């Protein structure tokens, strides 16, 4: 990251650039348990009723059990995952300031890349007994009567590439005026283009017909002392693949055309704003009133399939929104401010959800109801009108007590559901992102921070705290009989920090809490989960050695709080790995050094 700034008289020019690269390269050992809920393996359609089996039901769900003689299949997976993410960003900002006019421009560009490959070999086994306990109040456990792979083998390679870039140009101007309460007029325009594309490939390779003994010298058992799970299988994946099916062969990779898509978004906008300063009821008042016009056009290219027939497809959407806004700030005195704000806002749909490309049943083959799935290039943005009111009391240096309340009247939301559509004259049930109806989001937020100036010799110590409460009637579309609350809205969140600061040295220990909330944990927005409440403790130490050189040490999750997610809006239904599941991240430590030229 770097910044270059040049100034001459009233003109200022600044360039900043950023490049970052993160690589994840890890061996992954996994056991996949197939059919715990319902199995058809070896003709066994209900493993819970076999002789010797037992189970526990809570709220209609099987949450624990011992399955005997059920012949369930366990996949022993030896895998490797590599992911390289990079970000390149740059901006050129120019500003000229005169006595009356101020002119500015901003040219920016950024590009994010992600290349990831998951590669694996799989063995199988059919243990006589599988025992598990996934109840919400306990650490999940699962064990088998035998942990040894019994047969094999299959291989899988799944590369994926994602590209996301945006370029934008903004021009703005302001003019000082003396027209009653108005002090300045501001206006400007911005154009931007964003483009996102995805590519995915897949290879499945079958193993030779040979006994498990052919791999005995290449695999070994791995136990996880901190997790109550059955023994995992480790091994030399490349050598296992060579013996099992001749090695991983890149020529076997097939393009997954239905996961190949490209979405472009062009945004043109202009704004005008009047800034004012006056008095009302004997109180100084500042604020502004303005409007922003936004035109958005999206185009999407991809592929559709009807059965096994794949063909190119395109989609487009264009819409224009007028977004007025106004703010009022009542400067009650030197310590107290009352703020009001009202605005109409939009949030454009994620580009991933605007992808074209549908998987549709072939009516010449499918018997019964036709189904399909895919993206939706016709999505409208999330729209809302919001009102904010806050009261701030700055009762001492670096001390604040504040109360803020807000309400958002939502006109249109976005979520995944299954809708009935007529396609080529035929009735389909299509699962895709759709626009939903409106609702409200109400919230209140309390903030309190202060140094301990009122305690002798404790003025370098202080506290920061924040608590927010959210209420909303907005729901996701699934599960249909008990929809999840809108994604990202935690009813309760809180932060409490104790700090110490001398100017050159600062220490902070903090506690953060959130109540359960809905998340999209992975890359597929159709797969919703509910993240259980969490409370974490973090530590941060900062030492500014000189004007140029500084050091920072951070320790996160000192209490080793696990992550637990559940599905279907039922806390006892533990989510699978891709949707959060149960994960122990451990404590994380980070040491940084910064030098300013």
Label every model-predicted segment:
Residues 1-65, 85-92, 99, 324-326:
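Transmembrane beta-barrel wall of Gram-negative outer-membrane proteins
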Residues 8-10, 19-23, 98, 109-115, ...:
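Transmembrane beta-strands of outer-membrane beta-barrel pores
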Residues 9-10, 95, 100-104, 176-185, ...:
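Short loop/turn motifs that connect adjacent beta-strands in outer-membrane beta-barrel proteins
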Residues 44-72, 131-154, 201-259, 369-374, ...:
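Flexible glycine-rich, low-complexity coil/linker segments exposed to the extracellular/periplasmic environment
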Residues 79, 83-87, 259-265, 346-402, ...:
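Outer-membrane beta-barrel signature, preferentially recognizing the C-terminal barrel domain
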Residues 195-197, 222, 232-235, 239-243, ...:
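Surface-exposed extracellular loop regions of Gram-negative outer-membrane beta-barrel proteins
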Residues 405-410, 417-421, 426-520:
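Gram-negative outer-membrane beta-barrel transporters
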Residues 514-520, 542-597:
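C-terminal beta-signal and adjacent terminal beta-strands/loops
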């Amino acid at each position: 990251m770097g910044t270059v700034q040049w100034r001459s008289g009233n003109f200022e020019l600044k360039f900043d650039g950023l490049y970052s690269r993160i690589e994840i390269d890890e061996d992954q050992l996994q056991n996949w348990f197939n059919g715990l809920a319902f199995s058809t393996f070896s003709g066994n359609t209900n493993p819970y009723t076999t002789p010797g089996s037992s189970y526990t039901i809570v709220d209609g769900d099987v949450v624990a059990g011992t399955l005997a003689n059920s012949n369930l299949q366990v996949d022993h997976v030896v895998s490797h995952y590599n992911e390289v993410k990079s970000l390149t960003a740059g901006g050129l900002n120019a500003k000229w300031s005169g006595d009356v006019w101020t002119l500015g421009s901003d040219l920016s560009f950024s590009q994010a890349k992600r290349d990831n490959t998951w590669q694996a070999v799989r063995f199988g086994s059919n243990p006589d007994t599988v025992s598990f306990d996934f109840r919400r109040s306990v650490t999940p456990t699962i064990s088998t009567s035998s942990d040894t792979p019994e047969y094999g083998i299959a291989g899988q390679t799944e590369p994926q590439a994602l590209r996301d870039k945006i370029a934008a140009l903004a021009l703005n101007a302001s003019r000082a005026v003396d027209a009653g309460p108005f002090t300045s007029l501001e206006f400007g325009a911005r154009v931007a283009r964003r483009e996102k594309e995805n590519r995915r490939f897949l290879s499945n390779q079958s193993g030779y017909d040979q006994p498990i003994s052919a791999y005995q010298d290449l695999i070994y058992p791995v136990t996880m002392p901190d997790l109550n799970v059955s023994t995992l299988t480790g091994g030399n994946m490349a050598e296992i693949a060579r013996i099992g099916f001749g090695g991983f062969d890149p020529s076997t990779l097939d393009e997954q055309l239905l996961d190949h898509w490209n979405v472009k978004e062009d945004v043109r906008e202009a704004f005008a704003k009047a800034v004012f300063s006056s008095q009302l009821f004997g109180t100084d008042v500042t604020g502004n009133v303005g409007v922003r016009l936004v035109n958005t056009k999206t185009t999407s290219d991809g592929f559709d399939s009807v059965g096994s027939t794949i063909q190119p497809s395109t989609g487009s959407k264009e819409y224009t929104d007028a977004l007025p806004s106004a703010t009022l700030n009542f400067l009650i005195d030197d310590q107290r401010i009352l703020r009001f704000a009202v605005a109409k806002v939009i949030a454009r749909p994620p580009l991933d959800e605007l992808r074209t490309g549908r998987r549709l049943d072939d009516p010449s083959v499918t018997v019964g109801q036709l189904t399909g799935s895919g993206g939706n290039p016709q999505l409208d943005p999330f729209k809302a009108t919001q009102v904010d009111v806050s009261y701030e009391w700055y009762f001492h240096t670096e001390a604040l007590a504040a109360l803020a309340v807000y309400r958002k009247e939502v006109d249109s939301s976005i979520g995944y559901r299954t809708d009935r559509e007529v396609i080529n004259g035929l009735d389909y049930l299509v699962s895709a992102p759709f626009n939903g109806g409106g609702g409200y989001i109400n919230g209140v937020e309390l903030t309190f921070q202060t140094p301990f100036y009122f305690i002798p010799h404790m003025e370098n110590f202080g506290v920061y705290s924040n608590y927010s409460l959210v209420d909303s009637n907005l729901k996701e579309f699934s599960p249909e009989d008990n929809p999840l609350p809108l994604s990202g809205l935690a009813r309760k969140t809180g932060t409490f920090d104790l700090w110490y600061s001398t100017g050159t040295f600062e220490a902070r220990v903090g506690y953060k809490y959130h109540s359960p909330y809905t998340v999209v944990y992975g890359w597929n927005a159709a797969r919703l989960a509910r993240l259980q409440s969490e409370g974490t403790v973090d530590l941060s130490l900062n030492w500014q050695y000189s004007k140029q050189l500084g050091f920072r040490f951070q320790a996160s999750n000192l209490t080793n709080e696990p992550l637990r997610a559940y599905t279907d809006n039922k806390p006892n239904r533990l989510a699978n790995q891709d949707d959060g599941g149960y994960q122990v991240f451990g404590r994380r430590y980070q040491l940084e050094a910064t030098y300013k030229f």
